[in-house]
């Protein structure tokens, strides 16, 4: 089993979903955890975001694993708040070895109908928030003579997605940011990679808009979501992926097992990106 005993990991978006899974997986492998999350609504996000109780739940689950943990309410759109989280981590643990920049949102809307706020919130959280997270931790990692940064992109960092172009733009940007961070930080023994999940079973895609997308129109159900998830994978029996599957990749990238791996975008998608491309909704006549 991969061992990261003695490491300190700061994880954004850690209150639930993939972020909580990452926190528990890294803690089970020996890391102490700094768990952060916004824990309040964003008006342009159409589903309920994590709550302070969710964040407290992550903290409690990490403690059950016998690891030290602090939970901090922190909005990745706020650079000062991220700096404060890093300061709290250094004060409590003395260092930060690992950053998992996981915080993210998803929403739907044709590109030409998005409001300025919808566009800006998506970019501010999913791209600028990742940059702010890197910016906040790098000085501490340089002082510590190394570190590992794992960013959450998506299969939509490689491909387009009809109806959520602002998300696609942000996730493409994360991969460019990752590569440049790897290039600039290598001289300080800091690695930077990205994990690119496929369709993962979390609250982010468990709402009516996601059901309708999977059903191909209004009136979709959760069953349509579950059934449609099978279309995202080439592997037998795979529907929506478990967050734990993504966490295993995050742990590997964060660990010394990947000591010579940097600048890599790692899909964890059940083979989604090798699926033959088709037009699922062709227009036959003008």
Model regions: which residues?
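Substrate-binding pocket helix/loop in short-chain dehydrogenase/reductase
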Residues: 62, 110-111, 118-123
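Short C-terminal tail/terminal secondary-structure segment
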Residues: 159, 250-251, 262-286
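C-terminal helical subdomain
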Residues: 194, 216-261, 266-270
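Alpha-helical segment proximal to the catalytic Tyr-Lys
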Residues: 139, 183-184, 259
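Active-site helix of classical SDR
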Residues: 134, 170, 178
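Residue(s) in the substrate-gating loop at a strand-loop-helix junction
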Residues: 154
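Canonical Rossmann dinucleotide-binding motif of NAD(H)/NADP(H)-dependent dehydrogenases/reductases
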Residues: 3-40
């Amino acid at each position: 089993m991969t061992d990261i005993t003695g490491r300190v990991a700061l994880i954004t978006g850690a209150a639930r979903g993939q972020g909580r899974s990452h926190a528990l997986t890294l803690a089970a492998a020996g890391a102490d955890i700094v768990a952060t999350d916004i824990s309040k609504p964003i008006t342009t996000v159409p589903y309920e975001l994590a709550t302070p109780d969710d964040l407290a739940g992550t903290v409690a689950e990490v403690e059950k694993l016998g690891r030290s943990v602090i939970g901090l309410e922190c909005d990745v759109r706020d650079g000062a708040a991220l700096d404060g989280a890093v300061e709290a981590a250094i004060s409590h643990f003395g260092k930060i070895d690992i950053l998992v920049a996981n915080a993210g949102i998803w929403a739907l809307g044709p590109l030409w109908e998005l409001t300025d706020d919808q566009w800006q919130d998506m970019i501010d959280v999913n791209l600028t928030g990742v940059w702010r997270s890197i910016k906040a931790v790098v000085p501490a990692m340089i002082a510590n003579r190394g570190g590992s940064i794992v960013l959450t992109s998506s299969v939509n960092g490689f491909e387009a997605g009809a109806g959520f172009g602002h998300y696609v733009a942000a996730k493409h940007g994360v991969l460019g940011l990752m590569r440049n961070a790897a290039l600039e930080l290598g001289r300080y023994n800091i690695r930077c990679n990205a994990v690119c999940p496929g369709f993962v079973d979390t609250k982010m895609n468990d709402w009516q808009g996601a059901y309708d997308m999977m059903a191909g129109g209004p009136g979709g159900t959760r069953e349509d979501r579950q059934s449609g998830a099978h279309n995202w994978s080439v592997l037998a029996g795979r529907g929506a992926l478990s967050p734990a599957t993504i966490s295993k990749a995050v742990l590997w990238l964060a660990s010394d097992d990947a000591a010579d791996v940097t600048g890599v975008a790692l899909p964890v998608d059940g083979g989604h990106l090798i699926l033959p491309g088709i037009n699922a909704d062709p227009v036959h006549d003008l």
